[in-house]
Amino acid sequence: DMGYGDLGCNNPDSKIPTPNLDRLAKQGMRFTDAHASSSVCTPSRYNVLTGRYCWRSHLKRGIVWEWDALLINSDQKTVAHLLREQGYHTACLGKWHLGWNWPMKNGKHPNDYVDFGVPERAKRSELGKQIDYDSRIEGGPIDRGFNTYFGVDVPNFRPILGSRMTN
């Protein structure tokens, strides 16, 4: 992770040399008054990728749970879509935590068994045992405009490469 004060252009006393980023800052436009749309991860990620407030989605508070459905609608463009349209190759690396269309062995989705909100840990654990980990996981970064993805949905999960869990 890199903080705001780690860049030489923002902090002349920074211990980390960032000559290329400093040059970009000098030659381009700098945004120095940013605000987070939320203090937690899911809504902030949603906002950065879509440019929309997360509270306009079906998530009205908190974060998505580990087997939750995709938060970004299939017809909604992300910054990755916009970059690809301009010829860029995009990658998403790290924690996604915006939901996926998790495949279950019985063909359903974990949310089919949950009325509202985050289920209790025992219920989540039970649902996790029914996930088909060998199938493609739809609705993640690859289906939302990114060319490449490597990361986890939530901490302590097996890594996902593209749209499949790794061993």
State where each predicted segment sits.
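Formylglycine-dependent sulfatase
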Residues: 1-167
